[in-house]
Amino acid sequence: METIVNGFNQPNAQASPLAYGLTMVAAGLAIMGAGVVSVGQGMAVAKAVEAIGRNPEATSKIRSTLIMGLAIVETASIYCFIIALLIIFV
């Protein structure tokens, strides 16, 4: 059990250091995709709050549309995270 814990997330004996480094760069790029999605979500929420401030009667329509849009956009972030995990650990 100790060898599994000590060898966790370390390059294999077969993998070259360059391949391991490029793998980590690819995982970092995938996580950057998740960060870009988060910025887009923040902008969408800001515009929704602005729209509710201008037209409070449309709050329910704006909120439901916003939640649906954020759920669709969040899937891209989750996919980026899963891809990064697969790149690192598989």
From Swiss-Prot:
It is found in: Cell membrane. Pfam families: ATP-synt_C. InterPro entries: ATP_synth_csu_bac/chlpt, ATP_synth_F0_csu, ATP_synth_F0_csu_DDCD_BS, ATPase_proteolipid_c-like_dom, F/V-ATP_Csub_sf. It is a multi-pass membrane protein. GO terms for molecular function: lipid binding; proton-transporting ATP synthase activity, rotational mechanism. The record marks 74 as: Reversibly protonated during proton transport. It comes from the Bacteria. Gene3D superfamilies: lithium bound rotor ring of v- atpase (1.20.120.610). GO terms for cellular component: plasma membrane; proton-transporting ATP synthase complex; proton-transporting two-sector ATPase complex, proton-transporting domain. The chain crosses the membrane at residues 17-37, 70-90. The keyword tRNA processing does not apply. Keywords: ATP synthesis, Cell membrane, CF(0), Hydrogen ion transport, Ion transport, Lipid-binding, Membrane, Transmembrane, Transmembrane helix, Transport. Belongs to the ATPase C chain family. F(1)F(0) ATP synthase produces ATP from ADP in the presence of a proton or sodium gradient. F-type ATPases consist of two structural domains, F(1) containing the extramembraneous catalytic core and F(0) containing the membrane proton channel, linked together by a central stalk and a peripheral stalk. During catalysis, ATP synthesis in the catalytic domain of F(1) is coupled via a rotary mechanism of the central stalk subunits to proton translocation. Key component of the F(0) channel; it plays a direct role in translocation across the membrane. A homomeric c-ring of between 10-14 subunits forms the central stalk rotor element with the F(1) delta and epsilon subunits. F-type ATPases have 2 components, F(1) - the catalytic core - and F(0) - the membrane proton channel. F(1) has five subunits: alpha(3), beta(3), gamma(1), delta(1), epsilon(1). F(0) has three main subunits: a(1), b(2) and c(10-14). The alpha and beta chains form an alternating ring which encloses part of the gamma chain. F(1) is attached to F(0) by a central stalk formed by the gamma and epsilon chains, while a peripheral stalk is formed by the delta and b chains. This is ATP synthase subunit c. It comes from Metamycoplasma arthritidis (strain 158L3-1). The gene is atpE.
